[in-house]
């Protein structure tokens, strides 16, 4: 019976890890496109295109995107540590975001037992949105330009199942 449980846990882990987005290596063409693209700052989750919010919902594993539950606005309270003061607060908080005519770059922190910082790049149009690349930043980055540079240089690590 112990062997069956171990096999079940192993299979479940494999399924869960495969269902999450993996950091994609940027092609040379996409890297150059992002370098040259003009991005405008987005200061709120509600300022992101609906498709990008849907993409975040998929990354977070949410059934229905709820700003109050899934990600806090910049500077708002969230569950930054495993010492939960208010379980109603979201586990994530937006730090910065920027969008161009066809891409959005989202940078947020994720609380819990360890505070981590995550980056997600989405290609978006009014018709469709797709996750392009992203991962865990090696440390807190100071500016959205630093976030873009981390993405372009390939210094992001795999976020695994924890987005």
Where are these regions (language model features)?
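Positively charged n-region of N-terminal signal peptides that target proteins for export
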Residues: 1-5
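Bacterial N-terminal signal peptides
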Residues: 6-17
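Flexible low-complexity loop/turn motifs enriched in small/helix-breaking residues
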Residues: 19-102, 135-163
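Short beta-strand elements that form the blades of beta-propeller/WD-repeat-like
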Residues: 103-109
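Solvent-exposed loop/turn segments at secondary-structure junctions
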Residues: 110-113, 138-139
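Structural motif
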Residues: 114-120
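Short loop/turn segments immediately following beta-strands, especially the blade-tip
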Residues: 124-129
């Amino acid at each position: 019976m112990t062997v069956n449980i171990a096999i079940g846990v192993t299979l479940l882990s494999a399924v869960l890890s495969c269902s999450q987005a993996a950091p994609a290596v940027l092609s040379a063409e996409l890297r150059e496109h992002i370098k040259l693209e003009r991005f405008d700052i987005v200061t709120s989750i509600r300022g992101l295109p609906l498709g990008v919010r849907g993409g975040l919902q998929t990354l977070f594993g949410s059934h229905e995107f709820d700003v109050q539950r899934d990600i806090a606005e910049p500077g708002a309270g969230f569950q930054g540590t495993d010492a939960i003061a208010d379980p109603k607060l979201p586990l994530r908080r937006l730090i910065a975001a920027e969008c161009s005519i066809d891409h959005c770059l989202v940078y947020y922190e994720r609380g819990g037992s360890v505070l981590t910082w995550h980056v997600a790049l989405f290609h978006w149009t009014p018709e469709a949105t797709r996750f392009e690349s992203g991962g865990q930043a090696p440390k807190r980055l100071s500016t959205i330009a630093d976030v873009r540079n981390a993405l372009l240089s390939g210094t992001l690590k795999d976020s695994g199942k924890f987005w």
